[in-house]
Structure formats: structure tokens, C-alpha cells
Amino acid sequence: MASQEHYSSLWEEANQAVQAAIRTAQQAHLALEKAKASQIAYEIQHAEMEYQKAMKQLQAAQQHLPYVSAEQQIHFSQAEQMLNQESPQIQ
């Protein structure tokens, strides 16, 4: 029984890490879009910081991918692609 509880705990940890990475990637994507539209230096700097944070979080969450559902893996891949398309070359 302890093994099942341990597995469940690991799965939950993996799931939360992947979900957090996806949310951060979505936030960074929105920040980059806003910065592109506004061309305000502060917005651009903020968006670049969000992008870097999201990329680091996605990289850290990759180790958890084998332990989450196929649906979560798809969402993760979409978030990763979204960020790769929105790299901070804003001008």
C-alpha cells in the first residue's frame, strides 16, 4: 500500500510541475504578445523575463513528462511550441 501511495504522490508532483510549466508558458506568451503590441521598453523587458522563467520551468518539468497523462503531455508540447514561436525578438 505504501508503494501505491508513494506512486500517487510522485504522480501528483509530476502533474503539478507540468501544469505549472504550462501556465507559466501561457503567461509568458501573453506578455510577449502585449509587449509586441505596445513596444514599451518596460513591457518588453517584463516579457523577456517571463519568457526566460517559462523556458526554465518547461525544461525542469520535462523530467516529469513520462509520469503524466497523454493529454498533459500534449498540452506541454503545445506550450513549448508556443514559446518557441514567440521568442523575445520583439522588434
PLM feature spans:
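Long, charged/polar, soluble alpha-helical segments
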Residues: M1-Q91
